[in-house]
């Protein structure tokens, strides 16, 4: 028999969850409201929810859309880099994860252990040898230097490997009997079955590449090649800070990710749920 929950307990839980949700949403709400305030108001009262509503203006966003040409250059750079990283990462990481899950070859467990070890190492530790490698390859100040280290992500390999463990091997055997090659089995049969995991990892990889600040800052030199996070950081200088433009630009940076998640949240949740219980 199902036990009824006390009304008082339900109210307490609701209030508690509402308070936690408010704490989580508060910084974002503060950012959005501050982006509509002029620089003088921000300098006088700071970024706070207590302000004069009559000071709200669209001038910050109008400036970005009409005069901040370099902002859209940075925006385009981030979009292009994120798309390339997502496509290549999904392709190569899914192939590696699939191979580690399906094929029995010598050293398979060692390679999987290596993936787990790399997954636990902070990127800052690997950054110096990676940068030295980019110097030797003469890739500094190129988008290739930004994209190359993200092509095979350990977290994506682990995720796809766990998901591929639950794929029906009977389909592989049937395809081999019909004369299908191993590449054909992967691209025509298994990869479509990995759709939910691909959608989930596309959002995660896209979010990581979109917000990536440290590595592009290390390898990029030209101002017109900067990604959006680095470009926005250049608005903060010792000689003056354009907080109003910075806040409006930050809000515009969030919009593509929010739209992406709204349209793909069903696949994202399904991919994480199924991928988390495979194997």
Swiss-Prot record:
Could you tell me which residue ranges the ABC transmembrane type-1 domain spans? Answer: 75-264
Q: Does the keyword Iron-sulfur apply?
A: no
Which Pfam family, any one, appears in the UniProt record?
Answer: BPD_transp_1
User: Localized where?
Assistant: Cell membrane
Q: Which residues cross the membrane?
A: 8-28, 79-99, 110-130, 140-160, 184-204, 245-265
Q: Name any GO cellular component annotation.
A: plasma membrane
What the entry lists under InterPro entries is as follows: MetI-like, MetI-like_sf
What membrane topology was assigned to this protein in its record? Multi-pass membrane protein
- Keywords assigned by UniProt? Cell membrane, Membrane, Sugar transport, Transmembrane, Transmembrane helix, Transport
**Can you tell which superkingdom this protein's organism belongs to?**
Bacteria
Name one process (GO BP) from the record: transmembrane transport
- Main localization (coarse): membrane
Describe its function. Part of the ABC transporter complex AraNPQ involved in the uptake of arabinooligosaccharides. Responsible for the translocation of the substrate across the membrane.
What does the subunit comment say? Answer: The complex is composed of two ATP-binding proteins (MsmX), two transmembrane proteins (AraP and AraQ) and a solute-binding protein (AraN).
| Family as reported in the entry's similarity comment | Belongs to the binding-protein-dependent transport system permease family. MalFG subfamily.
Q: What is this protein called?
A: Arabinooligosaccharides transport system permease protein AraQ
Which species is the source of this protein? Answer: Halalkalibacterium halodurans (strain ATCC BAA-125 / DSM 18197 / FERM 7344 / JCM 9153 / C-125) (Bacillus halodurans)
């Amino acid at each position: 028999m199902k036990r009824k929950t006390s009304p008082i307990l339900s109210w307490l839980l609701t209030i508690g969850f509402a308070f936690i949700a408010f704490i989580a949403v508060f910084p974002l709400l503060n950012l959005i409201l501050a982006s509509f305030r002029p620089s003088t108001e921000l300098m006088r009262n700071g970024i706070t929810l207590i302000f004069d509503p009559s000071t709200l203006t669209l001038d910050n966003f109008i400036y970005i859309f009409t005069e901040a040409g370099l902002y859209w250059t940075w925006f385009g750079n981030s979009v292009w880099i994120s798309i390339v990283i997502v496509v290549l990462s999904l392709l190569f990481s899914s192939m590696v994860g699939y191979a580690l899950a399906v094929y029995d070859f010598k050293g398979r467990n060692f390679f999987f252990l290596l993936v787990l070890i790399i997954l636990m190492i902070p990127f800052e530790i690997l950054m110096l040898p990676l940068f030295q490698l980019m110097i030797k390859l003469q890739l500094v100040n190129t988008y290739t230097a930004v994209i190359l280290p993200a092509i095979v992500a350990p977290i994506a390999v682990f995720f796809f490997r766990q998901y591929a463990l639950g794929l029906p091997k009977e389909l592989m055997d049937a395809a081999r009997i019909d004369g299908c090659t191993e590449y054909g089995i992967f691209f025509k049969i298994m990869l479509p079955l990995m759709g939910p995991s691909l959608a989930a990892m596309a959002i995660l990889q896209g979010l990581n590449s979109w917000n990536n600040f440290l590595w592009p800052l290390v390898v990029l030199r030209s101002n017109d090649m900067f990604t959006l996070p680095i470009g926005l950081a250049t608005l903060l200088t010792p000689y003056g800070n354009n907080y109003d433009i910075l806040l409006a630009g930050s809000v515009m940076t969030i919009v593509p990710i929010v739209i992406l998640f709204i349209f793909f949240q069903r696949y994202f949740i399904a991919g994480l749920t199924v991928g988390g219980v495979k194997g």
